[in-house]
């Protein structure tokens, strides 16, 4: 079982349900081949072997099923969703020292939405910074780091940003290319939170943004 990628998790239940359906079908086939014996176990590092099969023929958790994970030694009491756990996911989060593991008594591999989002945050953080930066980072810092979606900004705003910082670009860039260029520069800026908030509040109170818009209206 390959588990789910961050892209699958961000797309919601459809992709995760498809993965779960494959798991259920494989478990049902294994059960039929062994004379209706119990489903085969899936080994997860540090968590032992558990049954990887959910309800026969199901494409998701059964009614009332709870998340299959344990956090800090205690079983999660949240309802299971369509996202599923795997050895690959266990390995990726273990490098971040996140204290979650598969419960040995669980008879399925479905996890709750809370842990799905937690795993996504940790894995996205790992992709952004790379494994060289793992030392010294705490799980709380990794999880609480916000992800800024610059694609939500208007094209004119992205161009304003590019002009303000004099970013070298070729003419005729589309929005996706602007987002990539602005995003790389944005992540490299050291920020003093107190000074930034103070400047923002001052700008709002003095309508500084309106003045900027008028000044930039003649610049292309």
Swiss-Prot record:
Transmembrane segments: none annotated. Residues 1-129 are annotated as: Interaction with NCOR1. It is found in: Nucleus. Pfam families: SAP30_Sin3_bdg, zf-SAP30. The modification Phosphoserine is found at residues 131, 138. A zinc finger (Atypical) spans 67-115. Keywords: DNA-binding, Isopeptide bond, Metal-binding, Nucleus, Phosphoprotein, Repressor, Transcription, Transcription regulation, Ubl conjugation, Zinc, Zinc-finger. One of its GO terms (molecular function) is DNA binding. One of its GO terms (cellular component) is nucleus. The modification Phosphothreonine is found at residues 5, 145. Residues 123-143 are annotated as: Disordered. There is a cross-link at residues 87, 194, 214 (Glycyl lysine isopeptide (Lys-Gly) (interchain with G-Cter in SUMO2)). Component of the histone deacetylase complex that includes at least SIN3A, HDAC1 and HDAC2. Found in a complex composed of at least SINHCAF, SIN3A, HDAC1, SAP30, RBBP4, OGT and TET1. Interacts with HDAC1. Interacts with SIN3A, SIN3B, HDAC2, RBBP4 and NCOR1. Interacts directly with SAMSN1. Interacts with HCFC1. Interacts with SAP30BP. Belongs to the SAP30 family. This is Histone deacetylase complex subunit SAP30. The gene is Sap30.
